[in-house]
Amino acid sequence: MTSDVTVGPAPGQYQLSHLRLLEAEAIHVIREVAAEFERPVLLFSGGKDSIVMLHLALKAFRPGRLPFPVMHVDTGHNFDEVIATRDELVAAAGVRLVVASVQDDIDAGRVVETIPSRNPIQTVTLLRAIRENQFDAAFGGARRDEEKARAKERVFSFRDEFGQWDPKAQRPELWNLYNGRHHKGEHIRVFPLSNWTEFDIWSYIGAEQVRLPSIYFAHRRKVFQRDGMLLAVHRHMQPRADEPVFEATVRFRTVGDVTCTGCVESSASTVAEVIAETAVARLTERGATRADDRISEAGMEDRKRQGYF
């Protein structure tokens, strides 16, 4: 005789979903940093990954206030929609925003402006802000699926007194045990989203109804093509004489400096539609739409060795 009774998990064997496991891991990392370090900061650009990270950090300490500030390294070449969302989310969360300006470093002669993109020189601004504010840990939204240099970086990534990363001297990380030991002047970069994928990020955004800048969804925009990428026409990004401008329905998979961030043609106007597109994507968002990663095969690793995000 057969039975139609479905046997569920035994009492005490409650199972978390994949997304909730990732959430729990990230919250554990954030709380670990808050307990272990004196002056942490959350790097916050207003992009999807940093917004998810802020959402997780607020959740980690609710109903209390976030016990550390957020910081944006501002190149001055930003998408207006992203800056507006950044300011609104920070105000709604009631957290302190530190803005580290690349323009200030250019004006002070600490760096020489690079053309067309300021992306390479923002490392100087980042390290200056960490040093001046005496931050000993900085949360970043990097994920291992984005790029090969990030794929081999630890959750707790040690930086020396010059802010440099040495991939050959990384510390072992067993299970959920993290080594935050450092001397004065050194700091740790912390990546709570290391084990997330782009698909996970969008699934979590949908599940938690996380608000994003409008440019992550399909919209009409004037663009031009350069090096196989669609770039947006912007006051800081103008086409060359041989680059015709046309209007297309596009969205951005990742958000960074206007001068090195491309968009993709898309009709996805909702989170569900973006998730469906992401599920069949064969290139990561950085591989598909970030010109700064195409400088060389080791472009990201070279920048990270110098102190980049």
Swiss-Prot record:
Keyword Nucleus: no
Pathway linked to the protein: Sulfur metabolism; hydrogen sulfide biosynthesis; sulfite from sulfate: step 1/3
GO CC annotation, single: sulfate adenylyltransferase complex (ATP)
EC numbers on record: 2.7.7.4
Domain of life where this protein originates: Bacteria
Keyword set, alphabetical order: ATP-binding, Nucleotide-binding, Nucleotidyltransferase, Transferase
Pfam families assigned: PAPS_reduct
Induction (record text): Induced by sulfur limitation and oxidative stress. Repressed by the presence of cysteine.
Single GO MF annotation: sulfate adenylyltransferase (ATP) activity
GO biological process: cellular response to oxidative stress; cellular response to sulfur starvation; hydrogen sulfide biosynthetic process; sulfate assimilation via adenylyl sulfate reduction
Catalytic activity: sulfate + ATP + H(+) = adenosine 5'-phosphosulfate + diphosphate
Similarity-based family: Belongs to the PAPS reductase family. CysD subfamily.
Function text: With CysN forms the ATP sulfurylase (ATPS) that catalyzes the adenylation of sulfate producing adenosine 5'-phosphosulfate (APS) and diphosphate, the first enzymatic step in sulfur assimilation pathway. APS synthesis involves the formation of a high-energy phosphoric-sulfuric acid anhydride bond driven by GTP hydrolysis by CysN coupled to ATP hydrolysis by CysD.
Note, other: Was identified as a high-confidence drug target.
Protein name: Sulfate adenylyltransferase subunit 2
Gene behind the chain: cysD
